[in-house]
A protein has these predicted regions:
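Conserved ATP-binding/catalytic motifs of P-loop helicase motor domains
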Residues: 2-299
Length: 299
């Protein structure tokens, strides 16, 4: 595991954090489990011992979701888990960002008032309309007032303008207008090689006035606050080193002839119905997937 920037607090709390965080984790004597447990303890210790915002990343299979669960289970801080989509929120055991913060669908412009040419379009929102037309209810306001730690999973899909809308919500509700995210610590989890933010051309043309890109790390609030970067670099999901190499090369767009040869050893053009049983079929269209699923349900 690599931590950048290497905050002094990591050195100060590492031994204590590993000792305290592992006590509630089921014992597994394998080397992989020991490494994973140590990483979980270090990440949990960093989150618990500092108020620094953290971006936790890593390739698929490095244990990001496992770490999320262990950090949340072991923290003394009051926390909420959110994610950009319903499926991501369900997998993380949380709720969607728009549900938790009652954000309107559309584009958030990080200004008190919209530029004149955007007024009346109905597709753009500013701080004024967010507060006046889309207020938080009492329950959600109290949750945000009590909050210490906000965990955002699948953060690669999170747009910078949405993160700034979250920032504004928390500054207002918590009465700390001059402090990014109202003083709430962020734990941002995701892989930037996976799904990017979705943005229409019209939205991008407008938002380019404030953002260099729409990735979450261009959020004005996050740039003001800064964050530590923790990268998990040990893959636990796959044990086959050759297959891990192929997956890494695919991820980084540097596939070799040897990689293709490895993949082709698994290529079969004809499979019987019995052999297909239990296999996952990937399709390019929802209609094809629906037909296959319906046929399987009828059997």
């Amino acid at each position: 595991m690599e931590i950048r920037p290497f905050d002094q607090a990591v050195h100060q709390h590492r031994t204590m954090s590993v000792r305290s965080a592992t006590s509630s984790i089921p014992m597994d004597r394998s080397p992989e489990a020991h490494i994973e447990t140590e990483m979980a303890a270090l990440a949990a210790g960093f989150v618990n011992s500092t108020d620094r915002h953290v971006f936790l990343t890593g390739k698929a299979g490095t244990g990001k979701t496992t770490l999320l669960r262990r950090v949340v289970a072991g923290t003394h801080k009051r926390c909420v888990i959110v994610a950009p989509t319903g499926i991501a929120a369900l997998n993380a055991g949380g709720v969607t960002i728009h549900s938790q913060f009652l954000l309107p669908f559309g584009t958030f412009v990080p200004e008190r008032r919209l530029p004149a040419e955007l007024v009346g379009s109905g597709r753009f929102h500013d701080r004024y309309t967010l507060d006046g037309r889309h207020p938080l209810n009492a329950v959600r306001r109290q949750v945000l007032r009590d909050l210490d730690l906000l965990v955002i999973d699948e953060v690669s899909m999170l747009r910078a303008d949405v993160l700034d809308a979250i920032d504004h919500r928390m500054r207002v509700v918590r009465g700390r207008a001059g402090v990014p995210f109202g003083g709430v610590q962020l734990l941002l989890i995701g892989d930037l090689f996976q799904l990017p933010p979705v943005v229409k051309d019209e939205e991008l043309q407008v938002l380019q006035r404030w953002y260099r890109s729409l990735h979450f790390f261009e959020s004005l609030g996050l740039r003001e606050a800064g964050y530590a970067h923790i990268e998990l670099d040990r893959i636990f999901r796959q044990r086959d080193e050759v297959f891990v190499r192929v997956l890494n090369n695919l991820r980084e767009d540097r596939v070799t002839a040897d990689d293709i040869a490895v993949l082709n050893t698994r290529h079969r053009t004809q499979l019987s119905e019995e052999e297909r049983e239990g296999l996952i079929t990937l399709t390019t269209h929802n209609r094809t997937a629906d037909e296959l699923n319906s046929a399987a349900m009828r059997r």
